[in-house]
Amino acid sequence: MILQPFVPVDGALPGPVLTEIAALYSTNHAFFELSGDFPDPNRITVEQVAQALADELAHEGAEILLARSAGRLVGLAAVLDPAPGSADGPQEPWIGLLLVDATAHRAGHGRAVATLVEERFRAAGRSAVQIAVLDNNPAASAFWQAQGYTPVRRAKDRERGRACTVMRKALADG
């Protein structure tokens, strides 16, 4: 599996890749029903995904990382370095979203993407990473805890005020 940044071309999001990403988002209607990020999780459009990605990339230090296996887009991570609100605390990076093609769940792609993101932060000299998991998503909470993340506090997300648990993982050397 390879992880590569999704980079706008002349300020625009490349159409063919955007179509692939929209298809990835569309497989995850169950997650988007929980998150409320789209008006109709069963009909996510390319335009809605383009806006969601543009909103993510508008934050300083934000990146969208695409995960490919055998040339196929199998996942995506939206990351932010440093984490939101880091001015008040440790300067740690943040995984804002990790999305895996729902038709390939339980194939190890989520774990592989999380590991690659962590390795990327470790290589950049970061000692820990954080994520917020929506409280209404116990499967995601179980996934992240299985990856070694521990709950550190309860919070409301900045976008929609949804209840979530902030989790953190120390990134060991090597």
PLM features: residue spans?
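Acetyl-CoA-dependent GNAT
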Residues: I2-H105, A114-L116, R120, A170-A172
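Conserved beta-strand-loop-alpha-helix junction that forms the acyl-donor binding cleft
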Residues: H105, I131-S141, D157-A163
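Glycine-rich phosphate-binding loop
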Residues: G108
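Residues forming the Rossmann-fold NAD(P)(H) cofactor-binding site
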Residues: R111
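Conserved GNAT acetyl-CoA-binding A-motif
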Residues: F121-A132
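Conserved acetyl-CoA-binding loop of GNAT-fold acetyltransferases
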Residues: Q145-R154
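Terminal substrate-recognition subdomain of acyl/acetyltransferases
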Residues: G161-G174
